[in-house]
Amino acid sequence: MDFKTFETIITKKFLSLTNKQLEQFKAIESLYREWNEKINVISRKDTEGIFSHHLLHSLSIAGYAQNRLSGKEILDVGTGGGFPGIPLAILYPESRFTLCDSIGKKTLVARSIAESLGLENVTVVQARAESLPGEFDFVVSRAVASLEDFLPWVKGKYRESVLLLKGGDINPEIAAACGRFRLSPGSIRSWKVQSWLQAEDFPGASAEDYAWFQEKFVIEL
């Protein structure tokens, strides 16, 4: 997916985007390509699909949550090179984002890119989530660990909810978490990303771009 296709999609989904935000989204590709020459932050293959596999995927959290993230304090756990935190920080400039990862080279990249984009609402820290002080309104993350492993890391860290990007067959994972933590199945909600992104949203893009989202979900608990 090229930027033009990405721009067409997000300007339909988020009607109040400014030119500044669009320029920030556009600049991301070259920044990650430059960093990937030094540090393999995202796979070489995924640099070709950065607008679909990374930006649009990250923004699907906003497609689900809509204005609930506006003006909030948000923790991105296991951010890696800055996903989903950096795209969400562009979309919600009035929200405060803390991006954490335990690997120093990844936080180096995320911090540099946030600074290059002029994102004053982003703080990047090298730390494990469970060691961070304080609470946040929301926790977000992208496929860092199973629910059984992830939930203890963020216990007591959020006031409202956890929003996770997941792929594949999520039902066994949800069932395992419900069993271990004695949660009712209805307390974990799953939302299919393709209920937000339809095939007609991909003008000029290959069918592969749309198909990639087929087994992608946002989970909230």
Where are the regions that the model predicts?
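Conserved SAM-binding loop of SAM-dependent methyltransferases across substrates and taxa
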Residues: 81-94
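S-adenosylmethionine
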Residues: 94-221
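A general structural signal for well-ordered alpha-helical segments in protein cores
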Residues: 3, 25, 29, 55-58, ...
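Class I SAM-dependent transferase core
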Residues: 1-71, 75, 105-108, 112-122
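Conserved S-adenosyl-L-methionine
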Residues: 76-80
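Residue-level signal for inorganic ion chemistry
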Residues: 32, 88, 166
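Alpha-helical structural signal in soluble globular domains
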Residues: 9, 22, 91, 176-180
